[in-house]
Amino acid sequence: PLAKMLHEKHPGVRLMVDNCYGEFVCEKEPSHYGADVCVGSLIKNPGGGLAPTGGYIVGTQDAIERIAYRLTAPGIGLEVGSYAASYQPFYQGLFMAPHTVAQAIKTACLAARVFEILGMTTTPAADEPRADIIQAIQMRTPERLVAFCQGIQMASPIDSMALPEPWDMPGYNDQVVMAAGTFVAGASIELSADAPMREPYTAYMQGGLTYTHGRIALQMALNRMVEQGALTLK
């Protein structure tokens, strides 16, 4: 493995993995393969849809101790807290996370299969192994892409009345369209979709707190695409 080779050649080097979107998808995490540190976001997979903010760092005792001293102060480390409100939603979300991630993966597999049947390219395919919760779907036309995102937004629990339109988002060379009617802003473990407005007009869908909601959202997205004349169902 890469980690073993790295540690043998450079014993003082620490290997860090950004595992955002990947937690609880596979049977083993990067730390099982020798990563010294893994980091990610608590408003994504490991927060289970309940964590309101924050990120996490896990790793070897030596690595975490060094990080803690840098974060706070030497000698203090982890002896001080970081969130005054309450840690309950973080721990409860972590408890729920494996199940919630499973719901998101089932939603992604369903989306992949549905759009494969409609003749579109999906990555990964419905029957391919997965390492994260992201599902890419090549919509091929801008009209189809926008209609899909609008349908996902219409099925959202928050701001379902909003209709996403492409806009000039800072940091991107192309216009971007986003559907994200989530309880927690930026929580990609909740069902959302986004895409740059460029060929092949690929939608990146992720999340889904429940498989039931994922199925409803996909149905509404297909309906929106048909209503807008972007898709014809035989």
Could you tell me what each predicted segment is?
Residues P1-A102, K106, F115, G119-T122, ...:
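Conserved PLP-enzyme active-site core in the AAT-like
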Residues L2, C26, A63, I67, ...:
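General structural feature for long, well-ordered alpha-helical segments within catalytic domains
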Residues E116-L233:
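Conserved C-terminal alpha-helix-loop-beta "cap" of PLP-dependent enzymes
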